[in-house]
Structure formats: C-alpha cells, structure tokens
Amino acid sequence: MDGLKSFLSTAPVMIMALLTFTAGILIEFNRFYPDLLFHP
C-alpha cells in the first residue's frame, strides 16, 4: 500500500489526473452550455 501511495503522488500521475479531471469538466460544461466556450 505504501508503494501505491508513493506512485500516485508522483508528478506525471498527478498531472494526468488533473488533465483528466479538467477535460471531464470541460466536456460536461460543453454538453450543457455548448455556445459559451466559443464566444468571441
């Protein structure tokens, strides 16, 4: 379990988790409000 915690706290894993989270939020936001992301 300690090795898993040290693996999950490394920088590439944290970056991938953050990017996945951000992409999910953008996809859901774009699903409900499709015109707001491309406003000039």
Curated annotation (Swiss-Prot):
GO terms for cellular component: photosystem I; plasma membrane-derived thylakoid membrane. Keywords: Membrane, Photosynthesis, Photosystem I, Thylakoid, Transmembrane, Transmembrane helix. The keyword Transmembrane applies. GO terms for biological process: photosynthesis. Pfam families: PSI_PsaJ. It is found in: Cellular thylakoid membrane. It is a single-pass membrane protein. The keyword Thylakoid applies. It comes from the Bacteria. The chain crosses the membrane at residues 7-27. InterPro entries: PSI_PsaJ, PSI_PsaJ_sf. May help in the organization of the PsaE and PsaF subunits. Belongs to the PsaJ family. This is Photosystem I reaction center subunit IX. It comes from Synechocystis sp. (strain ATCC 27184 / PCC 6803 / Kazusa). The lineage of its organism: Bacteria, Bacillati, Cyanobacteriota, Cyanophyceae, Synechococcales.
